[in-house]
Amino acid sequence: VRTNGTAHSYDAVDKITGEGIQIKSASIKNDCTSFGPTSTWDKLIFVDLAPFGEVDGNIWFYEIDSSNIYNIVLNYKKNETFRDQQLQGRRPRFSIKDKIINPLRLVPIKKINLME
């Protein structure tokens, strides 16, 4: 099953809606998430494996609104956005926690503890 007519970037596909889901994760406090120049998705999920700054069994899941990604300025000197870097064939990199989750005060859609 593919969405958007492409085979790019999907880690999972929602069997009910057919949406392509890209999953990003980090196991350190300050993530540096990388996207490919042709990355596409219908739904983006960020998995924080260290929500308290260290890996302790807690895992928090966030759904990230795509509209919050494409216009993020990643290079202030050149005023380059995420989309600009993709169009240049580059791999945009930034901290989803610092640029989206924390400033927007996003709440996890799911929290689990592997130790319970």
Annotated model-derived regions:
Residues 1-20, 24-116:
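Nucleic-acid endonuclease domains
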